[in-house]
Amino acid sequence: FIKEKEEIVFSILPTATQYARNSFFAGLMPSEIAKKYPQYWKNEEDDGGKNLFEKELLEANLKRLGKSNLRWSYNKITNVAAGKKLVEQFHKLKENDMNFLVYNFVDMLSHARTEMEVIRELADDESAYRSLTISWLEHSPLLDVIKKASEEKMNLVITTDHGTIKVNQPVKIAGERNTNT
């Protein structure tokens, strides 16, 4: 692989997936999504999934940018079976001008790190957490997709909607849902 460019960027967006990923695909701030596309936006206090319309937000974004003529795909991988299916159907990705792939595992792992005792035991410190993440990647269908993209000389942009920070002494803060407004 050839790393052409690496840069660190920051944002004023809250890092919660609901805000970060929806904004990423929509190309809009959360308040703008709520105004322009209320059918795709759920507020914090609303029930139901908060990231169910990423594909629709992406499509609207491409249209706004004058790129609706592009052939593109959107895939959200939430388990190993879906990842393997994507690898099997890689030939279809080659036909597109752009492919957007959401891979949820590392996000799920970071949440599990605080919620599941077994993950806390496996990844007690930053070094162990990185090792666990690298081990997962080395054995995941995602690496197969990256290798196939490299073999096909496809351009690949890897990004994230937010990061994670290990806190040594976590404190749970409880309050009404509108405490911060």
Language model regions located:
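Feature captures the catalytic ectodomains and active-site-proximal regions of enzymes
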Residues: 1-181
